[in-house]
A protein has these predicted regions:
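Active-site glycine-centered loops adjacent to acidic/histidine catalytic or metal-binding residues
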Residues: 7, 99, 125
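Glycine-rich, phosphate-binding/catalytic loops in enzymes
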Residues: 22, 73-75, 138
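Short glycine-rich anion-binding loops that position phosphate/pyrophosphate groups of nucleotides
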Residues: 11, 60-63, 125-127
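A generic "binding-loop/recognition-motif" signal
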Residues: 11, 100-101, 145
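A cytosolic small-molecule/anion-sensing beta-strand core signal
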Residues: 19, 59, 65, 134-135
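Conserved phosphate-binding loops in N-terminal lobes of ATP-dependent enzymes
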Residues: 2-59
C-alpha cells in the first residue's frame, strides 16, 4: 500500500508517494489547473497508477472547520468543496488541510521541528503561509483553522485581509 502527499500551490501541484513508514519513494509536479474540478481530476489521474490508500492534500487559503470547503485567493477559488471533488474524481478517501499546517506537521514528524515545544514555520511561495507550534502541538484558531500568516492586518483600524 502506498500513501500520497499533495501540495496544491498557486503555480504547481507537487506530488509525493510514500511507503507505510512514510519514506518518500517518488516525487514530481504538474502545473495547477485554474478550475478546481480540473485540479481534482489531475490529482486523481496522477495518483491512479500507484493504488494509493487515500489522498492527503495541503492547499493555500482558509478551510472551513470541517476541512471540506476552501477559499484560496491566490487560486481564485471561493468556497470550493475540494475534499468532495477529490473523493468524486478518485473514488478514494480525501483529506484537505491548510498547506502551512501540512508543512508544520511534516517538520514536526521528521524535520527540523522534531521535539520542539515552541516554534514558527513560515512558507513562501505564490503566497505566504505557515504554522505555529505551542506546547508541542500545532496551534489552530478557536474555530479550528490554521494561522494565515499572509492575512495579517497591518493597520489597527484596517479591514480584515
Amino acid at each position: 500500500m502506498f500513501l500520497s502527499g499533495i501540495d496544491i500551490g498557486g503555480t504547481s501541484i507537487k506530488f509525493g508517494i510514500f511507503d507505510e513508514q512514510l519514506n518518500l519513494l517518488q516525487q514530481w509536479s504538474r502545473p495547477t489547473p485554474k478550475e478546481p474540478a480540473a485540479a481534482a481530476a489531475l490529482i486523481a489521474a496522477q495518483l491512479e497508477p500507484y493504488h494509493v490508500a487515500a489522498i492527503g492534500a495541503g492547499a493555500p487559503g482558509t478551510l472551513n472547520a470541517a476541512h471540506e470547503t476552501i477559499t484560496a485567493d491566490n487560486l481564485a477559488w471561493v468556497d470550493v468543496p475540494l475534499a468532495a471533488l477529490l473523493r468524486r474524481a478518485s473514488g478514494l478517501p480525501a483529506v484537505v488541510i491548510n498547506d502551512g499546517h501540512a508543512a508544520m506537521l511534516a517538520e514536526m514528524r521528521s524535520g527540523a521541528l522534531q521535539n520542539v515545544q515552541t516554534g514558527i514555520l513560515l512558507t513562501l511561495g505564490t503566497g505566504i503561509g505557515g504554522g505555529i507550534v505551542i506546547n508541542g502541538q500545532c496551534w489552530r484558531s478557536p474555530t479550528g483553522l490554521a494561522p494565515e500568516l499572509g492575512h495579517i492586518i497591518t493597520h489597527s483600524d484596517g479591514l480584515p485581509c
